[in-house]
UniProtKB/Swiss-Prot annotation:
UniProt keyword NAD, yes or no: no
Residues that bind Mg(2+): 242, 283, 310
Top-tier EC class: lyase
GO BP annotation list: glycolytic process
Taxonomy of the source species: Bacteria, Bacillati, Actinomycetota, Actinomycetes, Propionibacteriales
Binding residue positions for (2R)-2-phosphoglycerate: 163, 335, 364-365, 386
Function: Catalyzes the reversible conversion of 2-phosphoglycerate (2-PG) into phosphoenolpyruvate (PEP). It is essential for the degradation of carbohydrates via glycolysis.
Annotated keywords: Cytoplasm, Glycolysis, Lyase, Magnesium, Metal-binding, Secreted
Protein name from the UniProt record: Enolase
Listed transmembrane segments: none
Residues at the catalytic site: 205, 335
Pathway: Carbohydrate degradation; glycolysis; pyruvate from D-glyceraldehyde 3-phosphate: step 4/5
GO CC list: cell surface; extracellular region; phosphopyruvate hydratase complex
MF annotations from Gene Ontology: magnesium ion binding; phosphopyruvate hydratase activity
Length: 426
């Protein structure tokens, strides 16, 4: 395998108009690769640190020139000459160079940019698609696209508490068909909203962001859209939520729909939703430090529904290990920039799978045209991916890459479908 001959980072803009890091890499055989780093709006307090400049004169303090400089001057000096295929060694060099427990010195955005660029370069050098290079010749499962078609919470300016209302085309026979169904429901929802005189402005992730009286009202609108598009809710297209409960948790209480609620009251609320709606997955239903609540929720409803830890686990093997020990959640949300390196991301997924936890690959609200997570979803057999609505270039870039992968795999491609969720297990 070729060695790393050149590395250069630059500051680019993400889908929210905020700066992020992009890294170019050239190997000594001439192979060139590039990777860009995403950024979140609702972030868990235990995530790896995204290094920002803090200079209010540039991009309201959100510039990433320090992270860029750390790549070009500090990281490059250590990894130039490394074999590009030695992913774990490259990542470990950067982690040790940083020396902190949260990548706060060099910046997770600096480290991840180099980590992902190295993987792309090594795959290109080996003349393999990224998903096959990382996952091996048996990588063939296409994930269910969890499409965020209605936004609330931190992703929208509305009265809806729940951050993401997603559709999951579980009844489709292929990713291509699932993508088509998702787009059909998305356009159907736009018509439903228009017919009711509701706004059709978009949130960060391409979903609609109308001002609605309640979270149940949002679910009812989506059910109407599914039916209007000619699909059967629960059989063809199911529902999923990302509550992002840490965003409205303070002083031991959840301020939800205008009332202060306890963990037990929130669990009872979700129990009612699961009984009424065809929900297959609920992400971050409780605060990231409410371990007892998570364990109780999982004990009570874990056989019926996927309970996903995002802010709870932050793609961190150590926090996931605590979740496994305390029986909190039954699925891991996978965000490469939460942990800040590819090898640690893979470690988290492998730990989850070994312990019977499902995984959902995920974008961030601040995205670029980078498609790495699409390949990762197939490489790591996550069976699920969320990359926003079937709209906006930075969202569909990932879904379109999955179309290409499915086409390339041909008859060996398998769509995860309903089997990806506990609600449909025998």
């Amino acid at each position: 395998m070729a060695t790393i001959e050149f590395i250069e980072a630059r500051e680019i803009l993400d889908s929210r108009g905020n700066p992020t890091v992009e890294v170019e890499m050239i190997l000594d055989d001439g192979t060139q690769a590039r990777a860009a780093v995403p950024s979140g709006a609702s972030t868990g307090q235990f995530e790896a640190v995204e290094l920002r400049d803090g200079d209010k004169k540039r991009y309201s303090g959100k510039g990433v020139l320090k992270a860029v400089e750390n790549v070009n001057e500090k990281i490059a000096e250590e990894v130039l000459g490394c074999d590009a295929s030695e992913q774990r060694i490259i990542d470990q060099i950067m982690i040790e160079l940083d020396g902190s427990d949260n990548k706060g010195k060099l910046g997770a955005n600096a480290i991840l940019g180099v980590s992902l660029a190295a993987a792309h370069a090594a795959a290109d050098c080996a003349e393999l698609p990224l998903y096959q290079y990382l996952g091996g010749p048996n990588s063939h499962v296409l994930p269910v696209p969890m499409m965020n078609i209605l936004n609330g919470g931190a992703h929208a300016d509305s009265d809806v508490d729940i951050q993401e209302f997603m559709i999951a085309p579980i009844g489709a026979e292929s990713f291509k068909q699932a993508y088509e169904w998702g787009a059909a429901v998305y356009h159907s929802l736009k018509k439903v909203l228009k017919d009711k005189g509701l706004a059709t402005g978009l949130g960060d992730e391409g979903g609609f962001a109308p001002n609605l009286p309640s979270n149940a009202a949002a679910l009812d609108l989506i059910l109407d859209a599914i039916k209007a598009a000619g699909f059967e809710p629960g059989k063809d297209v199911a529902l999923a939520l990302d509550v992002a409960a840490s965003e409205f948790f303070e002083d031991g209480k959840y301020t939800f729909e205008g009332q202060a609620k306890t963990s037990a009251e929130m669990i009872a609320y979700y129990e009612g939703l699961i009984a009424k709606y065809p929900l297959v997955s609920i992400e971050d239903p409780l605060d990231e430090e409410d371990w007892d609540g998570w364990a109780e929720f999982t004990k009570k409803l874990g056989e019926k529904i996927q309970i996903v830890g995002d802010d709870l686990f932050v793609t961190n093997p150590k926090r996931l290990a605590k979740g496994i020990e305390t029986k909190a959640a039954n699925a891991l949300l996978v965000k490469v920039n939460q942990i800040g390196s590819l090898s640690e991301t893979i470690d988290a997924v492998e730990l989850a799978h070994r312990n019977g936890y499902r995984c959902m690959m995920s974008h961030r609200s601040g995205e670029t045209e980078d498609t790495t997570i699409a390949d990762l979803a197939v490489a790591l057999s996550t069976g699920q991916i969320k990359s926003g609505a079937p709209a906006r270039g930075e969202r569909i870039a990932k879904y379109n890459q999955l179309l290409r992968i499915e086409e390339e795999l041909g008859d060996s491609a398998e769509y995860a479908g309903a089997s990806a969720f506990p609600r449909f297990q025998a």
